[in-house]
Amino acid sequence: MPEPNEAVRDLAERRVAARRERDFANADALRDELASLGFRMVDRPDGYDLEPIAPEVARRSAPRDVPSVLDAPSDLDVTVQWVVQGWAEDVARGIASFAAHAPSGLRVEHIVVDGSGADAAAFPEGAAVLLIDGDPGWGALRTAALRRSRGAVVVLVDGSVEAVGDAITPLVRALDDPTVGLVGPFGIVSDDLREFREDPGPEVDAIEGYLLAVRRDVLVAAGGFDERFRFYRTADIDLSFRIRERGLRALVVDVPVTRHEHRGWHRTPEADRDAASKRNFYRFLERFRGRTDLLVRGGAGTSGSAG
């Protein structure tokens, strides 16, 4: 039977404190959070027990069934969120690498939302794992993770990214500037909103979603993740522009990471990924067609679509 990890035990202790303060509404919400992580909290006169829930009970029928903590103040510094649409071992590698280079002085949680059917035990100890029935798509899985995000800063990481040093602290520090909306090491720019190319920045049109950090309140105010984006491609551009149209900047911040093969791209049949990419780009253009006022620079030449 699975043992409760650090994230589960922390929720249980917070529920004990809420009940002690007679904040029963919060205690009930924390109980639901525990259930979403696969554990039932059974109260005893001298404490409590944490009992694993059968996987089919622990799974949620939809991401929006995940209890939201967004109405409560952030009580952590950073939430690192991962989504799994296959290749759980890549995400496990990524979590382990970020944990091995954990920032000093920052309270960090890792949240995994799995839509691939992987077992929660596939991921490192200490990560909170939300199991979703079926794969509702990239945007919906990211929404589920956001609903559980307690950090003042939300960091999106793709399973193809591995940390080789402290990648979190530089991102958080860059977001201390209130004029900055989102940051990450991989930036892109465009001359015409149709073709995007990599750019070293510092200011860019969009941050690629392989590694992207944003303040939680900014992400929520911008509308969160668009669940129509079932495939990841261009969802990061759309999110970047929704944040930047609020008058905030996107900055490239160099961090110590390495990138492996993006298996969600390379293992998807070419015809399928091209069709999904085209649909996503049209969604972006529906919202931002003609908004060249949002472009940070012009320039000669293009190198094809990115995102």
Over which residues does each language-model region extend?
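Conserved donor NDP-sugar-binding/catalytic core segment of glycosyltransferases
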Residues: E162-F196
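Short, acidic, metal-binding catalytic loop of nucleotide-sugar glycosyltransferases
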Residues: A96-R107
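Donor nucleotide-sugar recognition loop
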Residues: V220-V252, P256-R259
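Glycine-rich, basic loop-to-helix element that forms the pyrophosphate-binding segment
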Residues: D133-S149
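Short aromatic/hydrophobic "clamp" motif used to bind/position activated sugar donors
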Residues: V154
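C-terminal, non-catalytic tails of nucleotide-sugar-dependent glycosyltransferases
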Residues: R64-D77, H101, G181-G184, D191, ...
